[in-house]
Amino acid sequence: MENNNSNDNIITKCNRCSISCNQKPLIENLRKSDIMFLGISAKIKEKEDEMPLSENTNSGKLIKMIEERLLEENNNLLCYRSNMVKCVPLNEKGKIRYPDNLEIENCIENLVYELNIVKPKVVVFLGRLVEKHLKKKIMELGYNTITIYHPSYIYVYRKKEIEKYVEESSKNISKYV
């Protein structure tokens, strides 16, 4: 199994756009995995070793619940978490904002680099924004894709439906692994 724990890769060295100076790109250790969860963009790191969709976020907690449900059926599954944009897009007040089209486009090469190492059986888009920008490209590369609601949407607007969300998401993802 290929594993690239080195920070010496094109993603960590990226400086294609201005948001690369906000903080070092947020990526997990690159390794072959069955499932790749793909969020919108990195968040501000609270710890140096923090990973994308960290469990100290509400989104990360829900992704962990989905992973655990999937592992109940197949304890050999490997999951990988990433974002469409690896750096943190900040507004002029230092608050996180949605990435713009140029920032997304600039990060496509990084995503392709990741996909070539991770080689997932399925890429799980977290929300319609990720799907809108990446579905065509990722399918052209030969990967299966599925879109689920972004976990933060569920956590904020449908909190009473978390168990249903976890169950339906894991059921739909399991069709590909």
Where are these regions (language model features)?
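A polyanion-binding, active-site-adjacent surface
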Residues: 2-156, 163-172
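A charged, well-structured terminal subsegment
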Residues: 173-177
